[in-house]
Amino acid sequence: MEPTEKLCKKMQGQEAGDKPRTAALETEGPLQDSALPIQDDQDKQSSLPRASLGKRPLSKTSEELMDAGTCRVHKAPTAAACGPQSEEEGCSPPERKAESLKPSISAVPGQATAGSLNSHEGDLKKESLEVTCQFRKKTRTLYRSDQLEELERIFQEDHYPDSDKRHEISQMVGVTPQRIMVWFQNRRAKWRKVEKLNEKETKNGPAAPSADSSQHRSAPELLDPMPTDLEPGPVPPENILDVFPEPPMLLTSEQTLTPFQNNEGAERVAVTPPLLSPPPIRRANLPLPLGPVQTPQVLPPMRDVPGSDSIYKDKAYVSWGTSIASPPTYSNLEDLGSQDYQASSQLGSFQLSQAPHLPLFPSLQSQFPYLPPFPYPIPSSMPFLPPEDSLFSFPFGFSGDSSQDYCPGPPPGQILLQPPAENMGTGPWSGHCLPEPPFPRPHYPQALGQPLGAEGYFPNLLPTPYALTMSKQSSLGLNGLLEGTRVETGSSLSKMSDEQTSSSLEQPALEEVRDKNKNSHAAGAKE
């Protein structure tokens, strides 16, 4: 109450300064007048709702002032005035809170209505979405294996069933007609996709194999001309390189039988024919004949001789059968002297005699005067020189049969085979290797024991006294000679393949043959 008393004293001092103190007996008018400004001040400080509350204590204070004195009156109203003010001040925070709550409460319903509207709209949207989702959502129908089998069977019968048939299928399968229709739609889509893929494969399939077949079409054609009934068969190029390392023995693209042209471009294909030939022959150092020679057929395998590489590099060879190689002309005939035959010249030497039926070799007589002796008869149409091997297989037997016999020969030498100009007959290798033999039919001996005459065999290669005496010899003496030599030399030398052993047996065999020839000549002269 102290602050209220102080306020009352101040107010009393102000009133005393303004107006003189009156007597104790004053009417209610001035008291009411003094109370009115206080009430006005209080009304200014307080709000409108407080006005009704402030009037009530003023009425009380007026009654109290009328009953009490001036001090009391002054004190009472102040106290009363202060009391209500304090009460008002004490009550102002809750009132303010109420006032602050009132507009908030008044605003809450609006906000609540707006929120409720928004929430209601959201609920409606959710419901609408749920409704639409329910319409869009499709449940997958799960079919059993028996149902799928039945549907597949019906689909193979009819791809487009009508409504009546769909109803029947639905009753059979146990699924609604709508689901049956959907299943058939999906099945038709799958069927169309498979059909398109098959069409693409059929279109692209024949195109690629046709290109491949056109590219590789020449390979089977090359194999058609090759003989299929021959036992040896074609030799691969790798084996040819290993066995015959020199280039003349290989067939190149220029030497093929028929150059095939491929569809994409013209390119020659090297075809390796089967190398079918008689037993291998050593290649020698003497040149080939200089005359025109018929084209042979097949290249025979020839073994390398040391010292002959410088002469026969990039040269072709004449052989039996059909071949592309042609006999080359040699300009170094003078260089090939008799140095290779000095070792064999000790056995005997003679000069070639001009034969009337060999006009192609007149120059060889002067260029090659020294040749080793050869004691056996050979067909006259073939200039036959001794081979390098000590054992050489003749294409005919000594008894006239087609078996092969081996005869001795000097170490260095060469075999020159000249195909005749006559028609070719059936030869000893017709059933083994070659289709055609190199020997003519009229020169085959019925028996080699016949006397040497017009049908003699190489009389020009024999020494002159031998040729003269043997032309007059009887068939019995020659038969005995040839049979004896065949028994002795053929049996002993046919089993030997090594060159050292054969060269050691070479000279004694020839000496025995000479002795027997002399004995036969002596017997013929005595008769």
UniProtKB/Swiss-Prot annotation:
What processes does the entry annotate via GO biological process terms?
oogenesis; ovarian follicle development; positive regulation of transcription by RNA polymerase II; transcription by RNA polymerase II
Q: Which SUPFAM superfamilies match?
A: Homeodomain-like
Phenotype of the disrupted gene, per the record: Male mice are fertile and show no obvious abnormality. Female mice lacking Nobox have normal gross anatomy and histology, but are infertile with atrophic ovaries that lack oocytes at 6 weeks of age.
Q: Where in the cell is it found?
A: Nucleus
What domain of life does the UniProt record list for this protein's source? Eukaryota
Alphabetically list the UniProt keywords: Developmental protein, Differentiation, DNA-binding, Homeobox, Nucleus, Oogenesis, Transcription, Transcription regulation
Q: Where the record puts its DNA-binding region(s)?
A: 136-195
Enumerate the Pfam families for this protein.
Homeodomain
Q: Where is this region: Disordered?
A: 1-126, 194-245, 271-306, 488-527
Compositionally biased residues, Basic and acidic residues: 194-203, 511-527
Q: What does this protein do?
A: Transcription factor which plays an essential role in postnatal follicle development. Binds preferentially to the DNA sequences 5'-TAATTG-3', 5'-TAGTTG-3' and 5'-TAATTA-3'. Directly regulates the transcription of POU5F1 and GDF9 during early folliculogenesis.
Tell me what this protein is called.
Homeobox protein NOBOX
